[in-house]
Amino acid sequence: MSGDVAEVPMAGFLCALAAKGPTVDEVTAFAEVMREKAGSVPHEGTVVEIVGTGGDEANTFNISTTSGFIISAAGIPVAKHGNRSVSSKCGAADLIEALGAKLELNGEQNEAVLNKANMCFMFAPVYHQAMKYAGPVRKALGVRTVFNILGPLANPAG
């Protein structure tokens, strides 16, 4: 999370962890560090936090983002969190961007969008800036890693 690990050892670690399967304690520790370093979106009241885990292996559409639109249209505020595709065909950010929305909104801007549109999109690179070190490795590996599990546990809206 600090850029101190070179890409090859990081790739080896992520592959080994994926092969053995992360323990609850390992996932918890990763999530705690991610949340400590993450930006946030202030909001009042309850919001549904929704994020997919990426790479459904069935090459379908982006289900979590579509679910967010439906939930929001039903009157329930949604704080959607996601990224570009890493291990699937279409990441949440790819879909949101294709619809013409701006991705790089800060917490206050997303709070205003949430209040006005009942849904906001928190682009992971804006809120999890430390992930810039793991991003290229994840993309090069092209397989699911522990980071796919961490998205839902590190939502910037709380």
Regions found by a protein language model. Give the residues of each.
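General beta-strand structural signal in soluble alpha/beta enzymes
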Residues: 50, 78-82, 103-107, 121-123, ...
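Short, flexible micro-motifs
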Residues: 6, 55-58, 94, 145, ...
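Conserved catalytic-core motifs characterized by acidic clusters
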Residues: 48-49, 83-84, 154-155
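A glycine-rich phosphate/pyrophosphate-binding beta-strand-loop-alpha-helix module
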Residues: 14, 61-117
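Electropositive phosphate-/nucleotide-binding environments in soluble metabolic enzymes
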Residues: 4-11, 21-28, 61, 65, ...
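Phosphate/diphosphate-binding glycine-rich loops and adjacent basic-rich segments that engage nucleotide
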Residues: 109-158
